[in-house]
Amino acid sequence: MKRSKTLRAADAKVDREKLYAPLEAVRLAKETSTTKFDATVEVAFRLGVDPRKADQMVRGTVNL
């Protein structure tokens, strides 16, 4: 499937080998967005905890 000019330009801005800082990643996500509505971004963190143990449960939300 052929990709549009907009998607190719957005893909060229992202270096897939680089680890981005959180602020830079959010800026890049907003800059390369092709939608005309507020999109959702999911972030996953590896915390190294055992979710089966009640004292190690981690939950929360963040507003950007």
Swiss-Prot record:
Purpose of the protein: Binds directly to 23S rRNA. The L1 stalk is quite mobile in the ribosome, and is involved in E site tRNA release.
Gene3D superfamilies: 3.30.190.20
PANTHER family xrefs: 54S RIBOSOMAL PROTEIN L1, MITOCHONDRIAL, LARGE RIBOSOMAL SUBUNIT PROTEIN UL1M
GO CC terms, sorted: ribonucleoprotein complex; ribosome
Similarity comment: family membership: Belongs to the universal ribosomal protein uL1 family.
Biological process terms in GO annotation: regulation of translation
InterPro entries per UniProt: Ribosomal_uL1-like
Keyword Ribonucleoprotein in annotation: yes
Organism: Streptomyces lavendulae
Quaternary structure and interacting proteins, as annotated: Part of the 50S ribosomal subunit.
Keyword Ribosomal protein found: yes
UniProt name for this protein: Large ribosomal subunit protein uL1
Gene Ontology molecular function: rRNA binding; tRNA binding
TM region positions: none
